[in-house]
Amino acid sequence: MTKLSRKLQTQKRHRRLRRFLIGDATRPRLSVFRSNNHIYAQVIDDSAQTTICSASTVDKELREKSEKLPSDCNSSSIVGKLLAKRAIKKGIKQVIFDRGGNLYHGRVKALADAAREAGLEF
């Protein structure tokens, strides 16, 4: 039996999770994508198939503050706070957290904790 690569393991977990994580207008889905260099998060209404708001380490608002954010937990927490601020501004308090098949650890956990501290409930 061959061992799956980390990327395939992540994709397999994500497919398994997405069967149960469905966001709607009252409680949209907070989806997280983590690459080697950046982290992206967006609040999605699956029933209308629209992205309500998003934030990432390549976001224009964050690039104005510093030239390049490193790929660490501090950057992820900044993205989490920014996303929560934007979601609350649009009237969203509760979300369903979709970790994107990644383990709830490190950068993904830092983003989630920062979003909770900024006022999102999940």
UniProtKB/Swiss-Prot annotation:
Disulfide bonds: none annotated. The keyword Ligase does not apply. One of its GO terms (biological process) is translation. GO terms for cellular component: cytosolic large ribosomal subunit. The keyword Nucleotide-binding does not apply. Keywords: Ribonucleoprotein, Ribosomal protein, RNA-binding, rRNA-binding. InterPro entries: Ribosomal_uL18_bac-type, Ribosomal_uL18_bac/euk. GO terms for molecular function: 5S rRNA binding; structural constituent of ribosome. NCBIfam families: L18_bact. Belongs to the universal ribosomal protein uL18 family. This is one of the proteins that bind and probably mediate the attachment of the 5S RNA into the large ribosomal subunit, where it forms part of the central protuberance. This is Large ribosomal subunit protein uL18. The lineage of its organism: Bacteria, Bacillati, Cyanobacteriota, Cyanophyceae, Synechococcales. The gene is rplR.
